[in-house]
């Protein structure tokens, strides 16, 4: 089977969630089947596996409407796009499109790196579900990363196509920390500082944890930082890192007592999986997607209760609790692997090929 992966959503500086998802799947697929990829910028190759590639137009350009004509000439057995926006006019190949989550219907703020006209279209697009249905129904099979999103897609009737889970996963090759070594009195938050992320409640909980340091790792605007600094309780220690490298992120996680996320809404929660894979327990808000991802490797609390968050941290201090929580975290993270996701994608690809052939012959 020759799988062509649309890697044009790969960043040129550092991975974001979509970029890492695509690159990791390409690497795992290439070990299993003939794999090639589409790019639109040579700089993307620095963050992608060494597989054959073809350079085409940007997925954000008007030429996207005609990209299928270029892909037709490559004669792939099946095409996988880690987004749902790939142009399909005139396509003559089986296609899998991806919807990661429905978070932007609740919180429609577009990513800042998008051009202004695209940001406007983004907001309009997320005001109703019918545009999503139009995009997804162009595929033969639709992929998503979680059972939670699959359920939401069914609830909103977003597609008539089969929906298959091709999950996210932590990066390979990371050795978990020693569960019997005492953790540092530190807590980690990795993620944006949008209001729904509820970082204020985490900061408020530090009032009851004066012996801990809260590390806020992500990049943050000066205005948002000033807002959060203003609510740091007296005696609490909160460190704003303003962005960290991959190595710095891992080093801080390896020392910490726990990773914390009290988000009220989430698309997936990759930092939870990353933390658990290193043996660092997670304290998370009690929402469905975190229940699915965190499983037995997380402690769940009311996202509106700073006291419940602080109590969960103190519970980890009890004799024998943290070492067992660390082992539970590693076991839970082990349920998510890129090998498993690649196998699921190959199964979805075979299904897409059969459905495409059936539709071409008028049987579906």
Feature roles, as predicted:
Residues 1-364:
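Carbohydrate transferase catalytic cores enriched for Leloir-type hexosyltransferases
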